[in-house]
Amino acid sequence: MDLYIQIIVVACLTGMTSLLAHRSAAVFHDGIRPILPQLIEGYMNRREAGSIAFGLSIGFVASVGISFTLKTGLLNAWLLFLPTDILGVLAINSLMAFGLGAIWGVLILTCLLPVNQLLTALPVDVLGSLGELSSPVVSAFALFPLVAIFYQFGWKQSLIAAVVVLMTRVVVVRYFPHLNPESIEIFIGMVMLLGIAITHDLRHRDENDIDASGLSVFEERTSRIIKNLPYIAIVGALIAAVASMKIFAGSEVSIFTLEKAYSAGVTPEQSQTLINQAALAEFMRGLGFVPLIATTALATGVYAVAGFTFVYAVDYLSPNPMVAAVLGAVVISAEVLLLRSIGKWLGRYPSVRNASDNIRNAMNMLMEVALLVGSIFAAIKMAGYTGFSIAVAIYFLNESLGRPVQKMAAPVVAVMITGILLNVLYWLGLFVPA
């Protein structure tokens, strides 16, 4: 009976996260978030957005997601939510999105081992190589506030902002390796962008009174998150319930501690101590990710499926799934409402509202560059410069044909086709992986 309940709850969870991705309300992968405004605004179709989501996510599913679960026996966020990002973006309607997500949840609990064997059976490791896409995407996206400053303000302010943002990254990497440099970098960049914009408005108050007319990109996009708050709250409740069932761990900082806590032979006192340690670790990790998640949500209108991830810490400490579900919904709803207040406040300043196009342009340009660079990394990892040559040839073939595949998605499509061709060449005896 317990297994059936677990299957039902997990299926509901993955179905709902797929639905959130389909509605462009929330996703798990930070790199997919800046892509979805393109989909919402009609600059990209679902096939193109789905190919990017697949390329960004599938490597982590095959490596981190499956390997962590096989090692610990616990489900994890990479395994549950990255595939539903892909399925939700690709689905043509809400019902299909929920259904595909729910099917994935059932498959995880019933067919994980055969799926893992299938993913790792190819002679050329396409899925593992696609993991190379993610690092450039997240690192490049962290620069969007800085690039927006370049577009909107003079060279002096741009130079100062560049020095501050880049030195922040250098200092964090050198002296605080436990912190996420992208989250700090994007936070400092947003502070610089907003500080320069608000200072500009205050200096020109007499010439151009500050008013609240019009919507900034922040208020416009946070309002979209608010419209999806009921769905987000349900996901928060389901995440909490699954974690409270002791079958799920939220991140790498807690999964191995929880494995020990839930293992046989551990006394209740020892187990609770380990659970408390895991909850504290998740809370501290969540603090580090608040700047990244909050600022990207404000800029893109797409939230994270687990919010600021504080819901994980609450889940572990809850006495039962029912209490956990209530607390999870409350925590993630409070986070969303706080975002709305921040978005409305920012909308009072004309220069912040005028930053909308610059922010969009910066995100689009950075994503194009990052996906191109990441795809090159992936192609080289597959087959050295043979893979590079094939991928570049396919990319420029798309250019010569008038871009039947949109420019942002083209590198990812090219590297996936490269992986398929390399496996065909292997089976024909024309290529041997290194």
Curated annotation (Swiss-Prot):
InterPro entries: Uncharacterised_YhfT. It comes from the Bacteria. The chain crosses the membrane at residues 50-70, 72-92, 95-115, 135-155, 158-178, 179-199, 229-249, 288-308, 319-339, 376-396, 412-432. One of its GO terms (cellular component) is plasma membrane. It is found in: Cell membrane. Keywords: Cell membrane, Membrane, Transmembrane, Transmembrane helix. Its main location: membrane. It is a multi-pass membrane protein. Pfam families: YhfT. This is Uncharacterized protein YhfT. The gene is yhfT.
